[in-house]
Amino acid sequence: MKEKLTHAESLTISSMLFGLFFGAGNLIFPAYLGEASGANLWISLLGFLITGVGLPLLAIASLGMTRSEGLLDLSGRVSHKYSYFFTCLLYLTIGPFFAIPRSFTVPFETGISALLPSGMAKSTGLFIFSLIFFAIMLFFSLRPGQIMDWIGKFLTPAFLLFFFFIMIMALLHPLGNYHAVKPVGEYASAPLISGVLAGYNTMDALAGLAFGIIVISSIRTFGVTKPEKVASATLKTGVLTCLLMAVIYAITALVGAQSRTALGLAANGGEALSQIARHYFPGLGAVIFALMIFVACLKTAIGLITACSETFAEMFPKTLSYNMWAIIFSLLAFGIANVGLTTIISFSLPVLMLLYPLAISLILLALTSKLFDFKQVDYQIMTAVTFLCALGDFFKALPAGMQVKAVTGLYGHVLPLYQDGLGWLVPVTVIFAILAIKGVISKKRA
Protein backbone atom coordinates (compact mmCIF):
# COMPACT_ATOMS: atom_id res chain seq x y z
CA MET A 1 0.00 0.00 0.00
CA LYS A 2 1.42 3.36 -1.09
CA GLU A 3 1.31 6.58 0.88
CA LYS A 4 1.24 8.95 -2.09
CA LEU A 5 1.44 9.19 -5.85
CA THR A 6 4.74 9.68 -7.65
CA HIS A 7 5.20 12.89 -9.64
CA ALA A 8 4.69 10.96 -12.89
CA GLU A 9 1.48 9.39 -11.59
CA SER A 10 0.15 12.77 -10.43
CA LEU A 11 0.87 14.25 -13.85
CA THR A 12 -0.86 11.34 -15.60
CA ILE A 13 -4.03 11.71 -13.52
CA SER A 14 -3.93 15.51 -13.87
CA SER A 15 -3.59 15.13 -17.64
CA MET A 16 -6.55 12.75 -17.63
CA LEU A 17 -8.68 15.11 -15.52
CA PHE A 18 -7.77 18.06 -17.74
CA GLY A 19 -8.78 15.98 -20.74
CA LEU A 20 -12.11 15.12 -19.14
CA PHE A 21 -12.83 18.77 -18.31
CA PHE A 22 -11.59 20.49 -21.42
CA GLY A 23 -14.08 20.13 -24.25
CA ALA A 24 -14.69 22.37 -27.23
CA GLY A 25 -16.77 24.79 -25.16
CA ASN A 26 -13.74 25.47 -22.98
CA LEU A 27 -11.97 26.83 -26.07
CA ILE A 28 -14.94 28.68 -27.50
CA PHE A 29 -15.77 30.71 -24.35
CA PRO A 30 -12.31 32.29 -23.77
CA ALA A 31 -11.69 32.88 -27.48
CA TYR A 32 -14.83 35.00 -27.73
CA LEU A 33 -14.09 36.65 -24.37
CA GLY A 34 -10.72 37.76 -25.72
CA GLU A 35 -12.19 39.16 -28.92
CA ALA A 36 -15.00 41.00 -27.13
CA SER A 37 -12.81 42.31 -24.28
CA GLY A 38 -10.04 43.85 -26.35
CA ALA A 39 -8.19 46.32 -24.13
CA ASN A 40 -10.07 45.00 -21.08
CA LEU A 41 -8.69 41.50 -21.68
CA TRP A 42 -6.95 40.85 -18.37
CA ILE A 43 -9.69 42.09 -16.07
CA SER A 44 -12.29 40.06 -18.02
CA LEU A 45 -10.02 37.03 -17.91
CA LEU A 46 -9.58 37.42 -14.15
CA GLY A 47 -13.34 37.24 -13.71
CA PHE A 48 -13.51 34.23 -16.00
CA LEU A 49 -10.81 32.38 -14.06
CA ILE A 50 -12.52 33.04 -10.72
CA THR A 51 -15.55 31.00 -11.75
CA GLY A 52 -14.32 29.00 -14.75
CA VAL A 53 -11.33 27.58 -12.85
CA GLY A 54 -12.12 28.38 -9.22
CA LEU A 55 -15.47 26.57 -9.07
CA PRO A 56 -14.22 23.32 -10.67
CA LEU A 57 -11.26 23.35 -8.29
CA LEU A 58 -13.59 23.78 -5.31
CA ALA A 59 -15.75 20.92 -6.61
CA ILE A 60 -12.77 18.57 -6.71
CA ALA A 61 -11.57 19.88 -3.34
CA SER A 62 -14.99 19.19 -1.78
CA LEU A 63 -14.73 15.52 -2.76
CA GLY A 64 -11.16 15.31 -1.49
CA MET A 65 -11.63 17.15 1.81
CA THR A 66 -14.77 15.22 2.75
CA ARG A 67 -13.21 11.91 1.62
CA SER A 68 -16.33 11.21 -0.42
CA GLU A 69 -16.47 8.31 -2.87
CA GLY A 70 -18.21 10.47 -5.45
CA LEU A 71 -21.24 12.68 -5.98
CA LEU A 72 -23.69 10.11 -4.62
CA ASP A 73 -21.75 9.93 -1.36
CA LEU A 74 -21.30 13.70 -1.08
CA SER A 75 -24.94 14.59 -1.79
CA GLY A 76 -26.01 11.95 0.74
CA ARG A 77 -25.17 14.55 3.38
CA VAL A 78 -28.51 16.16 2.51
CA SER A 79 -30.50 12.90 2.57
CA HIS A 80 -30.42 9.43 1.03
CA LYS A 81 -33.36 10.10 -1.32
CA TYR A 82 -31.99 13.49 -2.34
CA SER A 83 -28.62 11.95 -3.22
CA TYR A 84 -30.28 9.63 -5.75
CA PHE A 85 -32.47 12.40 -7.16
CA PHE A 86 -29.64 14.92 -7.51
CA THR A 87 -27.06 12.43 -8.80
CA CYS A 88 -29.37 10.93 -11.43
CA LEU A 89 -30.54 14.34 -12.63
CA LEU A 90 -27.02 15.76 -12.81
CA TYR A 91 -25.47 12.84 -14.68
CA LEU A 92 -28.36 12.47 -17.13
CA THR A 93 -28.42 16.20 -17.89
CA ILE A 94 -24.70 16.75 -18.40
CA GLY A 95 -24.37 13.28 -19.94
CA PRO A 96 -26.64 11.68 -22.55
CA PHE A 97 -29.25 14.47 -22.61
CA PHE A 98 -26.92 17.43 -23.20
CA ALA A 99 -23.13 17.40 -23.14
CA ILE A 100 -22.51 14.09 -24.92
CA PRO A 101 -24.85 14.82 -27.88
CA ARG A 102 -23.21 18.25 -28.11
CA SER A 103 -19.85 16.48 -28.27
CA PHE A 104 -21.12 14.83 -31.46
CA THR A 105 -22.43 18.00 -33.08
CA VAL A 106 -19.94 20.71 -32.02
CA PRO A 107 -16.90 19.27 -33.86
CA PHE A 108 -19.11 18.61 -36.87
CA GLU A 109 -20.58 22.12 -36.99
CA THR A 110 -17.36 24.01 -36.21
CA GLY A 111 -14.81 21.94 -38.10
CA ILE A 112 -15.85 18.79 -39.95
CA SER A 113 -18.76 20.25 -41.97
CA ALA A 114 -16.33 22.55 -43.82
CA LEU A 115 -14.43 19.48 -45.04
CA LEU A 116 -17.47 17.61 -46.46
CA PRO A 117 -17.46 16.77 -50.18
CA SER A 118 -19.53 19.19 -52.24
CA GLY A 119 -23.00 17.87 -52.84
CA MET A 120 -23.23 15.85 -49.62
CA ALA A 121 -26.26 16.74 -47.52
CA LYS A 122 -25.36 18.13 -44.11
CA SER A 123 -27.67 15.65 -42.36
CA THR A 124 -25.95 12.77 -44.13
CA GLY A 125 -22.54 14.09 -43.13
CA LEU A 126 -23.64 14.46 -39.51
CA PHE A 127 -24.99 10.91 -39.45
CA ILE A 128 -21.77 9.42 -40.86
CA PHE A 129 -19.57 11.52 -38.57
CA SER A 130 -21.61 10.80 -35.45
CA LEU A 131 -21.58 7.07 -36.28
CA ILE A 132 -17.77 7.14 -36.36
CA PHE A 133 -17.65 9.28 -33.21
CA PHE A 134 -20.10 6.90 -31.50
CA ALA A 135 -18.00 3.84 -32.38
CA ILE A 136 -14.74 5.37 -31.09
CA MET A 137 -16.39 6.72 -27.93
CA LEU A 138 -18.05 3.40 -27.11
CA PHE A 139 -14.83 1.44 -27.80
CA PHE A 140 -12.93 3.45 -25.20
CA SER A 141 -15.83 3.67 -22.75
CA LEU A 142 -16.17 -0.12 -22.60
CA ARG A 143 -12.62 -0.26 -21.28
CA PRO A 144 -12.86 2.00 -18.20
CA GLY A 145 -9.75 0.50 -16.63
CA GLN A 146 -7.70 2.01 -19.46
CA ILE A 147 -9.27 5.48 -19.47
CA MET A 148 -6.27 6.96 -17.64
CA ASP A 149 -3.97 5.75 -20.41
CA TRP A 150 -6.27 6.63 -23.31
CA ILE A 151 -7.04 10.16 -22.15
CA GLY A 152 -4.10 11.03 -19.88
CA LYS A 153 -1.32 9.65 -22.08
CA PHE A 154 -2.69 9.91 -25.62
CA LEU A 155 -5.78 12.05 -26.28
CA THR A 156 -4.85 15.00 -24.02
CA PRO A 157 -1.28 15.23 -25.40
CA ALA A 158 -2.74 15.01 -28.93
CA PHE A 159 -5.13 17.86 -28.18
CA LEU A 160 -2.34 19.97 -26.66
CA LEU A 161 -0.17 19.28 -29.71
CA PHE A 162 -2.83 20.61 -32.10
CA PHE A 163 -3.60 23.50 -29.75
CA PHE A 164 -0.02 24.72 -29.33
CA PHE A 165 0.69 24.15 -33.03
CA ILE A 166 -1.76 26.97 -33.74
CA MET A 167 -1.20 29.10 -30.64
CA ILE A 168 2.60 29.25 -30.77
CA MET A 169 2.40 30.59 -34.31
CA ALA A 170 -0.23 33.12 -33.21
CA LEU A 171 1.88 34.27 -30.24
CA LEU A 172 5.07 34.54 -32.30
CA HIS A 173 3.33 36.44 -35.09
CA PRO A 174 0.40 38.28 -33.46
CA LEU A 175 -2.30 39.66 -35.71
CA GLY A 176 -2.46 42.92 -33.79
CA ASN A 177 -2.16 44.78 -30.51
CA TYR A 178 -5.12 44.02 -28.25
CA HIS A 179 -4.53 47.30 -26.34
CA ALA A 180 -5.86 49.12 -29.40
CA VAL A 181 -9.01 46.99 -29.61
CA LYS A 182 -12.16 48.65 -28.26
CA PRO A 183 -14.20 46.39 -25.94
CA VAL A 184 -17.76 45.65 -27.02
CA GLY A 185 -21.03 45.14 -25.17
CA GLU A 186 -20.87 44.31 -21.48
CA TYR A 187 -17.12 43.71 -21.72
CA ALA A 188 -16.82 47.49 -22.15
CA SER A 189 -19.06 48.54 -19.25
CA ALA A 190 -18.52 45.70 -16.75
CA PRO A 191 -15.57 43.53 -17.83
CA LEU A 192 -14.95 41.82 -14.48
CA ILE A 193 -18.60 40.84 -13.93
CA SER A 194 -18.94 39.77 -17.57
CA GLY A 195 -15.92 37.52 -17.16
CA VAL A 196 -17.33 36.05 -13.94
CA LEU A 197 -20.63 35.27 -15.69
CA ALA A 198 -18.86 33.74 -18.70
CA GLY A 199 -16.85 31.46 -16.40
CA TYR A 200 -19.99 30.61 -14.43
CA ASN A 201 -21.74 29.63 -17.66
CA THR A 202 -19.16 26.94 -18.43
CA MET A 203 -20.84 25.06 -15.54
CA ASP A 204 -17.62 23.11 -15.00
CA ALA A 205 -18.31 22.71 -11.27
CA LEU A 206 -20.87 20.09 -12.34
CA ALA A 207 -18.16 18.31 -14.29
CA GLY A 208 -15.86 18.49 -11.26
CA LEU A 209 -18.44 16.64 -9.18
CA ALA A 210 -19.23 14.21 -11.99
CA PHE A 211 -15.63 13.24 -12.77
CA GLY A 212 -14.65 12.82 -9.13
CA ILE A 213 -15.50 9.11 -9.24
CA ILE A 214 -13.00 8.57 -12.10
CA VAL A 215 -10.22 10.50 -10.34
CA ILE A 216 -10.67 8.59 -7.08
CA SER A 217 -10.70 5.19 -8.81
CA SER A 218 -7.60 6.16 -10.84
CA ILE A 219 -5.72 7.13 -7.68
CA ARG A 220 -6.59 3.78 -6.14
CA THR A 221 -5.39 2.02 -9.29
CA PHE A 222 -1.90 3.31 -8.48
CA GLY A 223 -2.08 1.68 -5.04
CA VAL A 224 -3.05 4.66 -2.87
CA THR A 225 -6.06 3.42 -0.89
CA LYS A 226 -6.09 5.09 2.54
CA PRO A 227 -8.96 7.62 2.58
CA GLU A 228 -6.81 10.50 3.83
CA LYS A 229 -4.12 9.79 1.20
CA VAL A 230 -6.72 9.51 -1.57
CA ALA A 231 -8.12 12.86 -0.43
CA SER A 232 -4.67 14.48 -0.51
CA ALA A 233 -3.93 13.06 -3.98
CA THR A 234 -7.32 14.24 -5.26
CA LEU A 235 -6.57 17.80 -4.12
CA LYS A 236 -3.09 17.74 -5.66
CA THR A 237 -4.28 16.51 -9.05
CA GLY A 238 -7.14 19.02 -8.97
CA VAL A 239 -4.75 21.92 -8.42
CA LEU A 240 -2.43 20.78 -11.24
CA THR A 241 -5.39 20.35 -13.59
CA CYS A 242 -6.83 23.77 -12.86
CA LEU A 243 -3.44 25.46 -13.28
CA LEU A 244 -3.18 23.95 -16.76
CA MET A 245 -6.74 25.05 -17.54
CA ALA A 246 -5.89 28.61 -16.46
CA VAL A 247 -2.84 28.69 -18.76
CA ILE A 248 -4.83 27.40 -21.74
CA TYR A 249 -7.64 29.87 -21.05
CA ALA A 250 -5.19 32.79 -20.86
CA ILE A 251 -3.44 31.86 -24.12
CA THR A 252 -6.73 31.35 -25.96
CA ALA A 253 -8.18 34.65 -24.73
CA LEU A 254 -4.98 36.55 -25.61
CA VAL A 255 -4.84 35.15 -29.15
CA GLY A 256 -8.54 35.90 -29.57
CA ALA A 257 -8.01 39.52 -28.50
CA GLN A 258 -5.02 39.96 -30.83
CA SER A 259 -6.90 38.52 -33.79
CA ARG A 260 -9.71 41.05 -33.80
CA THR A 261 -7.72 43.86 -35.39
CA ALA A 262 -7.17 41.75 -38.52
CA LEU A 263 -10.14 39.37 -38.58
CA GLY A 264 -12.89 41.40 -36.91
CA LEU A 265 -15.35 40.25 -34.26
CA ALA A 266 -16.54 36.71 -34.93
CA ALA A 267 -20.06 35.49 -34.17
CA ASN A 268 -18.69 33.08 -31.57
CA GLY A 269 -15.45 31.62 -30.25
CA GLY A 270 -15.57 28.60 -32.54
CA GLU A 271 -15.68 30.80 -35.62
CA ALA A 272 -12.88 32.98 -34.20
CA LEU A 273 -10.56 30.00 -33.65
CA SER A 274 -11.38 28.60 -37.08
CA GLN A 275 -10.48 31.94 -38.70
CA ILE A 276 -7.21 32.11 -36.73
CA ALA A 277 -6.23 28.56 -37.75
CA ARG A 278 -6.99 29.21 -41.43
CA HIS A 279 -5.09 32.51 -41.35
CA TYR A 280 -1.84 31.00 -40.07
CA PHE A 281 -2.13 27.74 -42.00
CA PRO A 282 -4.00 28.35 -45.27
CA GLY A 283 -5.51 25.10 -46.52
CA LEU A 284 -4.14 23.04 -43.64
CA GLY A 285 -5.62 25.25 -40.92
CA ALA A 286 -9.17 23.94 -41.34
CA VAL A 287 -7.92 20.36 -40.93
CA ILE A 288 -5.82 21.17 -37.83
CA PHE A 289 -8.74 23.02 -36.24
CA ALA A 290 -11.16 20.18 -37.02
CA LEU A 291 -8.79 17.63 -35.47
CA MET A 292 -8.29 19.78 -32.36
CA ILE A 293 -12.03 20.18 -31.79
CA PHE A 294 -12.66 16.49 -32.55
CA VAL A 295 -10.12 15.31 -29.97
CA ALA A 296 -11.33 17.87 -27.40
CA CYS A 297 -14.92 16.63 -27.68
CA LEU A 298 -14.04 12.94 -27.91
CA LYS A 299 -12.10 12.80 -24.66
CA THR A 300 -14.83 14.66 -22.77
CA ALA A 301 -17.52 12.37 -24.21
CA ILE A 302 -15.55 9.27 -23.18
CA GLY A 303 -15.18 10.65 -19.68
CA LEU A 304 -18.88 11.47 -19.38
CA ILE A 305 -20.00 8.03 -20.60
CA THR A 306 -17.56 6.39 -18.18
CA ALA A 307 -18.58 8.54 -15.21
CA CYS A 308 -22.32 8.15 -15.91
CA SER A 309 -22.06 4.38 -16.38
CA GLU A 310 -19.89 3.81 -13.30
CA THR A 311 -22.26 5.89 -11.17
CA PHE A 312 -25.45 4.20 -12.38
CA ALA A 313 -23.88 0.75 -12.01
CA GLU A 314 -23.00 1.71 -8.43
CA MET A 315 -26.42 3.18 -7.65
CA PHE A 316 -28.39 0.30 -9.15
CA PRO A 317 -26.11 -2.74 -8.75
CA LYS A 318 -28.89 -5.31 -9.26
CA THR A 319 -30.14 -3.91 -12.57
CA LEU A 320 -27.59 -3.45 -15.36
CA SER A 321 -23.83 -3.89 -15.66
CA TYR A 322 -21.42 -1.04 -16.38
CA ASN A 323 -21.11 -2.15 -20.02
CA MET A 324 -24.88 -2.14 -20.54
CA TRP A 325 -25.19 1.35 -19.06
CA ALA A 326 -22.36 2.54 -21.35
CA ILE A 327 -24.09 1.10 -24.43
CA ILE A 328 -27.49 2.57 -23.46
CA PHE A 329 -26.09 6.04 -22.75
CA SER A 330 -24.03 6.00 -25.98
CA LEU A 331 -27.04 4.98 -28.10
CA LEU A 332 -29.20 7.60 -26.43
CA ALA A 333 -26.64 10.33 -27.10
CA PHE A 334 -26.25 9.17 -30.72
CA GLY A 335 -30.00 9.31 -31.29
CA ILE A 336 -30.41 12.74 -29.70
CA ALA A 337 -27.49 14.17 -31.69
CA ASN A 338 -29.13 13.13 -34.98
CA VAL A 339 -32.80 13.62 -34.22
CA GLY A 340 -33.64 16.18 -31.59
CA LEU A 341 -30.62 17.98 -30.17
CA THR A 342 -32.16 21.45 -30.39
CA THR A 343 -35.28 20.35 -28.54
CA ILE A 344 -33.33 18.43 -25.91
CA ILE A 345 -31.01 21.39 -25.30
CA SER A 346 -33.98 23.74 -24.88
CA PHE A 347 -35.19 21.54 -22.02
CA SER A 348 -31.76 20.64 -20.64
CA LEU A 349 -30.63 24.23 -20.14
CA PRO A 350 -33.37 25.04 -17.58
CA VAL A 351 -32.45 21.88 -15.66
CA LEU A 352 -28.79 22.93 -15.68
CA MET A 353 -29.77 26.35 -14.34
CA LEU A 354 -31.54 24.56 -11.49
CA LEU A 355 -28.73 22.08 -10.82
CA TYR A 356 -25.79 24.48 -10.83
CA PRO A 357 -26.79 26.54 -7.76
CA LEU A 358 -27.61 23.29 -5.93
CA ALA A 359 -24.15 21.97 -6.79
CA ILE A 360 -22.41 25.17 -5.67
CA SER A 361 -24.28 25.26 -2.34
CA LEU A 362 -23.39 21.59 -1.74
CA ILE A 363 -19.72 22.30 -2.51
CA LEU A 364 -19.69 25.33 -0.19
CA LEU A 365 -21.23 23.38 2.68
CA ALA A 366 -18.89 20.43 2.19
CA LEU A 367 -15.78 22.63 2.19
CA THR A 368 -16.76 24.46 5.37
CA SER A 369 -18.57 21.66 7.18
CA LYS A 370 -15.84 21.03 9.77
CA LEU A 371 -15.18 24.72 10.31
CA PHE A 372 -18.81 25.54 11.14
CA ASP A 373 -19.89 22.12 12.40
CA PHE A 374 -22.74 21.80 9.88
CA LYS A 375 -25.31 19.10 10.62
CA GLN A 376 -27.62 17.29 8.21
CA VAL A 377 -30.42 19.74 8.98
CA ASP A 378 -28.14 22.62 7.89
CA TYR A 379 -27.53 20.89 4.55
CA GLN A 380 -31.29 20.44 4.17
CA ILE A 381 -32.12 24.08 4.98
CA MET A 382 -29.45 25.40 2.59
CA THR A 383 -30.54 23.01 -0.16
CA ALA A 384 -34.23 23.91 0.26
CA VAL A 385 -33.54 27.65 0.03
CA THR A 386 -31.23 27.16 -2.96
CA PHE A 387 -33.81 25.00 -4.71
CA LEU A 388 -36.60 27.56 -4.25
CA CYS A 389 -34.40 30.39 -5.54
CA ALA A 390 -32.91 28.37 -8.41
CA LEU A 391 -36.43 27.51 -9.58
CA GLY A 392 -36.59 31.12 -10.74
CA ASP A 393 -33.61 30.58 -13.04
CA PHE A 394 -35.22 27.32 -14.20
CA PHE A 395 -38.44 29.10 -15.22
CA LYS A 396 -36.54 31.95 -16.89
CA ALA A 397 -34.51 29.50 -19.00
CA LEU A 398 -37.57 27.59 -20.28
CA PRO A 399 -38.39 27.86 -24.01
CA ALA A 400 -40.25 31.09 -24.80
CA GLY A 401 -43.64 29.43 -25.24
CA MET A 402 -43.44 27.70 -21.86
CA GLN A 403 -42.42 30.63 -19.67
CA VAL A 404 -44.93 31.79 -17.06
CA LYS A 405 -44.55 35.56 -16.97
CA ALA A 406 -46.28 35.89 -13.62
CA VAL A 407 -43.70 33.55 -12.05
CA THR A 408 -40.63 35.06 -13.70
CA GLY A 409 -41.95 38.55 -12.95
CA LEU A 410 -42.34 37.67 -9.27
CA TYR A 411 -38.83 36.23 -9.06
CA GLY A 412 -37.44 39.25 -10.91
CA HIS A 413 -39.12 41.59 -8.44
CA VAL A 414 -37.99 39.70 -5.32
CA LEU A 415 -34.49 38.41 -6.14
CA PRO A 416 -31.46 40.65 -6.83
CA LEU A 417 -29.29 39.61 -9.82
CA TYR A 418 -32.17 37.55 -11.24
CA GLN A 419 -31.74 38.99 -14.73
CA ASP A 420 -28.09 37.86 -14.69
CA GLY A 421 -29.07 34.26 -13.93
CA LEU A 422 -27.83 34.63 -10.35
CA GLY A 423 -31.09 35.15 -8.50
CA TRP A 424 -30.12 32.49 -5.98
CA LEU A 425 -26.82 34.13 -4.95
CA VAL A 426 -27.91 36.76 -2.40
CA PRO A 427 -30.47 34.70 -0.43
CA VAL A 428 -28.21 31.64 -0.37
CA THR A 429 -25.29 33.77 0.85
CA VAL A 430 -27.47 35.17 3.64
CA ILE A 431 -28.68 31.71 4.70
CA PHE A 432 -25.12 30.37 4.62
CA ALA A 433 -23.96 33.23 6.86
CA ILE A 434 -26.78 32.55 9.35
CA LEU A 435 -26.00 28.81 9.45
CA ALA A 436 -22.27 29.54 9.84
CA ILE A 437 -22.88 31.91 12.78
CA LYS A 438 -25.17 29.30 14.37
CA GLY A 439 -22.45 26.69 13.93
CA VAL A 440 -19.78 28.88 15.54
CA ILE A 441 -22.04 29.60 18.53
CA SER A 442 -22.85 25.89 18.92
CA LYS A 443 -19.15 24.97 18.86
CA LYS A 444 -18.36 27.53 21.56
CA ARG A 445 -21.12 26.20 23.80
CA ALA A 446 -20.01 22.59 23.34
UniProtKB/Swiss-Prot annotation:
| Annotated TM spans | 13-33, 41-61, 81-101, 120-140, 154-174, 196-216, 237-257, 285-305, 325-345, 347-367, 381-401, 421-441
- Any Pfam family from its record, for instance, is Branch_AA_trans
User: Cellular component GO terms, alphabetically?
Assistant: plasma membrane
Gene Ontology MF term list: L-isoleucine transmembrane transporter activity; L-leucine transmembrane transporter activity; L-valine transmembrane transporter activity
Q: Which InterPro entries match?
A: Brnchd-chn_aa_trnsp_Livcs (IPR004685)
Q: Does the keyword Nucleus apply?
A: no
Membrane topology listed for this record: Multi-pass membrane protein
| Record-level GO BP terms | isoleucine transport; L-leucine transport
Note how its activity is modulated. Leucine uptake is inhibited by the proton ionophore carbonyl cyanide m-chlorophenylhydrazone (CCCP).
Please provide the record's keywords in A-Z order: Amino-acid transport, Cell membrane, Membrane, Transmembrane, Transmembrane helix, Transport
Where does it live in the cell? Cell membrane
UniProt record similarity statement: Belongs to the branched chain amino acid transporter family.
What is the role of the protein in this entry?
Branched chain amino acid transport system which is involved in the uptake of leucine, valine and isoleucine. The proton motive force is probably the driving force for transport.
What is the official name of this protein in its record? Branched-chain amino acid permease BrnQ
Protein source organism: Lactobacillus delbrueckii subsp. lactis
Question: What taxonomic ancestry is recorded?
Answer: Bacteria, Bacillati, Bacillota, Bacilli, Lactobacillales
